Amino acid sequence: MTNGGGGNNGAANRTEELQPHPVKEQLPGIQYCVNSPPPWLEAVVLGFQHYLLSLGITVLIPSVLVPLMGGGYAEKVKVIQTLLFVSGLTTLFQSFFGTRLPVIAVASYAYIIPITSIIYSTRFTYYTDPFERFVRTMRSIQGALIITGCFQVLICILGVWRNIVRFLSPLSIAPLATFTGLGLYHIGFPLLARCVEVGLPGLILLIFVTQYLPRFLKMKKGVMILDGSRCDRYGMILCIPLVWLFAQLLTSSGVYDHKSHTTQTSCRTDRTGLITNTPWIYIPYPFQWGSPTFDITDSFAMMAASFVTLFESTGLFYASARYGSATPIPPSVVSRGTCWLGVGVLLNGMLGGITGITTSTENVGLLAMTKIGSRRVIQISAAFMIFFSIFGKFGAFFASIPLPIMASLYCIVLCFVSSVGLSYLQFCNLNSFNIKFILGFSFFMAISIPQYFREYYNGGWRSDHHSNWLEDMIRVIFMSHTTVAAIIAIVLDCTLCRDSDEAKKDCGMKWWDKFRLYNLDVRNDEFYGLPCRLNKFFPSH
């Protein structure tokens, strides 16, 4: 007997209605989260990858600034070793007593403008001996860094930064975290193109190994010939030596013998002067260049740079929490982490590390590429940093990797950092015109405003004008894509999206409320709790 009508057949044939992708408070797909360490051998290899990646910025900034100060290869080597030593110490402090997230502390670009102003100050033009000018300039930079480090520690201890971070919502975090990656576009392809014959093959090889090779390893019906996850997990350690060897072959064959000085510096594997000038053993010690000198006008611009690194590090803390498969980091823990970064700035000022300390954007991207967000991996990486800063000959060998090769890796890892900010938009209502305006305006102005200041000061309009401390403060803040994006997004978010329950829901604030205080989510202790029951003595609120 057949059923009458077609209603039942229609119901049986009706396809399941498509639903949006579900919201995920913790990112799935991470193979080892913050507090789940991989096996020791694997952790050592992964930690070494993070160490290699941190070398790029550690070598780049002293290589630019030390010659301007009058220093030679010997001075540059000592500054690099000191910077690496302080970065390793600060990373350990951060992983044990700070945010406890898998982040690495490295040299900051934000301090370059105030440091350059100190270098070109007229009070150092009277020194004809290059070494004497280097020492005098370094002492002045150290004094400014010491004051800046104390300033950063103070505003974090007093809870000022914690209260600022509490104004954040998923809507304002999106541009903040996104531009921590996008804002470093100048160390991507522009740096790679300085030696395109080694940089471009490196980029292509990395993309193939990490993205396409796992697909080729699959047989029919999804059976793997080899574990494809190993490709992205160890893609860096597989590709960088191959491209480095290719660069060595080009150097040995005389390809660059008659090229320009700039090309040889970027492409040759024997032009850094690090290996020959690095001592076998060197331990950085306080005030190795003499007693610091203090000038309050130098410190003002440095404090502005510290303000910029606070925004950058905050965005990267949220990014690393995402890639570590942790819950969103509470504001009190953010303040705790930035306080330890201030300690790193203070240590750099005491030891002579030439610049301030911030969270490494590149290493956060490597968390995503490897899908390993373990805290132990970062602690091992910090141990590598300290070891190779003391036993310098070994570290100098790895630091001699040409920067265009490192730039090929930056093009990969920075894209992951840029995209993690966009993932916070899953908590927002993207059909709201208010949300569309805030997002679009903050993104557009974060590109447009820094470009205006870059043209205004470097494009010839004011290129012959010696800037003062106030102009340096303005330049540092408004030439930072991350800071501009964060300020605009926070102001618009707080003034346009907090006046009703519906508006708060649109910007994600309703979902965000349970993460604004440490004790409102029981999972926070799992990821952010201090060791040895220190939470009893240093409670988070």
From Swiss-Prot:
The lineage of its organism: Eukaryota, Viridiplantae, Streptophyta, Embryophyta, Tracheophyta. GO terms for molecular function: transmembrane transporter activity. It comes from Arabidopsis thaliana. Keywords: Membrane, Transmembrane, Transmembrane helix, Transport. The keyword Thylakoid does not apply. It is a multi-pass membrane protein. Pfam families: Xan_ur_permease. This is Putative nucleobase-ascorbate transporter 10. The chain crosses the membrane at residues 52-72, 79-99, 101-121, 141-161, 173-193, 196-216, 235-255, 299-319, 376-396, 397-417, 433-453, 476-496. It comes from the Eukaryota. One of its GO terms (cellular component) is membrane. Belongs to the nucleobase:cation symporter-2 (NCS2) (TC 2.A.40) family. It is found in: Membrane.
